[in-house]
């Protein structure tokens, strides 16, 4: 698997994400600039957390106009795998690559803590190394992680199996306890929890490693289940 992490001005999880993919999961991973317009060399493109362009206007609202986003839309339309984490999730919704939107947390506070998740769909490119119903603990760190969608969209997400991760104890008010969703075709995932911060036992746990192992399995056919 060859992956790329888009490093926007204000991204602060890009190096963590590259480390998780390259050093821990053992795949190739480049940092690329938001001016890049050709993504055809990659199997997976990752949009990291942080505060892209200072989160002015609202989270992700400016980043979506970067030249790389037009290339990312083409990449996704061609079937390439895209994952947006935290601010990356916000950017993907702003760009129209994922349904719904991220609002201010229910209590209007920034939340930074580990949270319990449940795996809802283990049949995606991002979750095939987990089991349905498996319980995970991943860190969150966001002020605008409250997932919102209209009733029709929520119904479609549930019917189509697009909800991949769900909060066990909803920390931010997200509708249907949604922590991570895919697009309708299943090749784009957005999630608020940070899997790249949960890949080393020394730092608190390895529950996030399965996200990257799943992508390796999907792109290379190399089943690495059990390595966690």
Curated annotation (Swiss-Prot):
The keyword Endoplasmic reticulum does not apply. Pfam families: GATase_5. It is found in: Cytoplasm. Keywords: ATP-binding, Cytoplasm, Glutamine amidotransferase, Hydrolase, Ligase, Nucleotide-binding, Purine biosynthesis. Residues 2-225 form the Glutamine amidotransferase type-1 domain. GO terms for biological process: 'de novo' IMP biosynthetic process. The keyword RNA-binding does not apply. Its EC number is 6.3.5.3, 3.5.1.2. It catalyses: N(2)-formyl-N(1)-(5-phospho-beta-D-ribosyl)glycinamide + L-glutamine + ATP + H2O = 2-formamido-N(1)-(5-O-phospho-beta-D-ribosyl)acetamidine + L-glutamate + ADP + phosphate + H(+); L-glutamine + H2O = L-glutamate + NH4(+). GO terms for molecular function: ATP binding; glutaminase activity; phosphoribosylformylglycinamidine synthase activity. CDD domains: GATase1_FGAR_AT. Signal peptide: none annotated. Pathway: Purine metabolism; IMP biosynthesis via de novo pathway; 5-amino-1-(5-phospho-D-ribosyl)imidazole from N(2)-formyl-N(1)-(5-phospho-D-ribosyl)glycinamide: step 1/2. GO terms for cellular component: cytoplasm. The active site is at 86 (nucleophile), 194, 196. Part of the phosphoribosylformylglycinamidine synthase complex involved in the purines biosynthetic pathway. Catalyzes the ATP-dependent conversion of formylglycinamide ribonucleotide (FGAR) and glutamine to yield formylglycinamidine ribonucleotide (FGAM) and glutamate. The FGAM synthase complex is composed of three subunits. PurQ produces an ammonia molecule by converting glutamine to glutamate. PurL transfers the ammonia molecule to FGAR to form FGAM in an ATP-dependent manner. Part of the FGAM synthase complex composed of 1 PurL, 1 PurQ and 2 PurS subunits. This is Phosphoribosylformylglycinamidine synthase subunit PurQ. The gene is purQ.
